[in-house]
Amino acid sequence: MIENTILKKNKEGKIANVFGLTFPSLELVELAAHAGFDAINCDGEHGLFSPEAIDNICRVANGYGMSVTARVPDKSPYWINLFLDRGVQGIVGPHVESKQEAQDFADACLFPPLGKRSWGGGRGTEFNDDQKLSDYGGKLKYAEWTNSNMLIIAQIESVPGWDNLEEILSVEGLSGITGG
């Protein structure tokens, strides 16, 4: 996995330029790379993204040194795992309305002990390649590295969500919020 380019830019005090997709297009990913974008964001809630499309987009984007983020169809662990296991390094969780929903969402994005993400066998876990994982110091160190490279954004899209904003912002693991 590559370092999360959005978080890297943030740490450097710079703005990351993110190219948004509502449909899968490897050609647009390549054009975004040549145009100087730092990352790709896939709208999996309103767009046309299968897990295979996300996998291919991650492969091409990472090859150009760009991270991929995605808004998942819903914030269930099922969808979050499908996207993260393919190499997505940032998740936007739609329709967050309460502190508990925000906590469950963050937990699904992070490996233990910070969260409850399960260990898959795809790009997001280096395909369980023991040699590659040993480059990070083993599975536990890789999980720590992955957690530190994860962008977790709660999307507030309702009056109850905005009414609970302070509580939502108190959730450990959230990187930020966005409106909708």
Stretches with model-predicted labels:
Residues 21-35, 74-82, 159-171:
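Short, acidic/polar
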